[in-house]
Amino acid sequence: MAQQTPLYEQHTLCGARMVDFHGWMMPLHYGSQIDEHHAVRTDAGMFDVSHMTIVDLRGSRTREFLRYLLANDVAKLTKSGKALYSGMLNASGGVIDDLIVYYFTEDLFRLVVNSATREKDLSWITQHAEPFGIEITVRDDLSMIAVQGPNAQAKAATLFNDAQRQAVEGMKPFFGVQAGDLFIATTGYTGEAGYEIALPNEKAADFWRALVEAGVKPCGLGARDTLRLEAGMNLYGQEMDETISPLAANMGWTIAWEPADRDFIGREALEVQREHGTEKLVGLVMTEKGVLRNELPVRFTDAQGNQHEGIITSGTFSPTLGYSIALARVPEGIGETAIVQIRNREMPVKVTKPVFVRNGKAVA
């Protein structure tokens, strides 16, 4: 039996089509995925992300532990509330999960991890935390709502009290603050400004209804996927998994190589991969009729005349741009064009950076 978030009843009241998503009943859409997508790009939309796992870590050696656990370096986190995106790697350099870590105090940090990887993440974290004496608290008492779009912060702020409005005033991206019952973070998965708000389960439904009344459109998993793909954001299990290096998933920027003497899980394997080269993640654009889909082969000939093949990891029709886009993992040496096999047709595609839309505007 699939689990339900505290907002399940609100989704059904809003007319959602519910689907099983990694063991959770979640809204796919509320009538029109396209309308929901455009609401986030032009105004304000919201997503129930309560299926994600919030984990609080306490102990005097928490920073030391996270410097070992994660490929990015929490030594960068010096201001309370600052957040960092990182891969959590296995010994062979594969990605166990990608996550966000928040620094509150020297003995309190918070992780937000994916729902699909919850059990293995908690097992891995618990196993490696033991020698550091870390107290691990899974915050199943909290729900989370992502409010995203150019007007999202202003509309959400109408629900805040004076102290909460003051707490978030001027807050830069990738920060979080606890203000009363709300943990408000300037993070998201859409390429738009907004907040991700964690709050007690029993208060989630009232907060959701108030956001609807404030003019924020409920959005489902369908729009969440097209928005994140336009923004060039990875989805665990597609762009990366335990067999794929972060270097092959456009996550090289999240690896803190310096200081060179910091030992983190997977470092040795990554250094070998960096030296010998890996595949890389690129963007693909197809303006001709048709849709680029996951797992389609991508073929190209390099400058030396050698033929290579890669694979589309995520593909869709872009509602913002009006044509098909994809992320693809390909060998090094790809040029500005490639061929994608769609059924029995060879379709030309343009190779771009793996990001297509930011703040409502085309990047590619």
From Swiss-Prot:
A Pfam short name: GCV_T
EC number(s) from the headed UniProt entry: 2.1.2.10
Keyword Protein biosynthesis attached: no
Annotated InterPro entries: GCS_T, GCS_T_bac, GCST_C, GCV_T_N, GcvT/YgfZ/DmdA, GcvT/YgfZ_C, TrmE/GcvT_dom1
GO molecular function terms attached to this record: aminomethyltransferase activity; transaminase activity
Cystine pairs: none
GO cellular component terms listed in the entry, alphabetical order: cytosol; glycine cleavage complex
Domain of life: Bacteria
GO biological process: glycine decarboxylation via glycine cleavage system
Reactions accelerated catalytically: N(6)-[(R)-S(8)-aminomethyldihydrolipoyl]-L-lysyl-[protein] + (6S)-5,6,7,8-tetrahydrofolate = N(6)-[(R)-dihydrolipoyl]-L-lysyl-[protein] + (6R)-5,10-methylene-5,6,7,8-tetrahydrofolate + NH4(+)
Keyword terms, alphabetized: Aminotransferase, Transferase
Keyword match Transferase: yes
Main function: The glycine cleavage system catalyzes the degradation of glycine.
Family: Belongs to the GcvT family.
Subunit structure, as described in the record: The glycine cleavage system is composed of four proteins: P, T, L and H.
HAMAP family linked to this entry: GcvT
Family matches, as PANTHER family: AMINOMETHYLTRANSFERASE, AMINOMETHYLTRANSFERASE, MITOCHONDRIAL
Protein's name in the database: Aminomethyltransferase
The species this protein was found in: Shigella boydii serotype 18 (strain CDC 3083-94 / BS512)
Lineage: Bacteria, Pseudomonadati, Pseudomonadota, Gammaproteobacteria, Enterobacterales
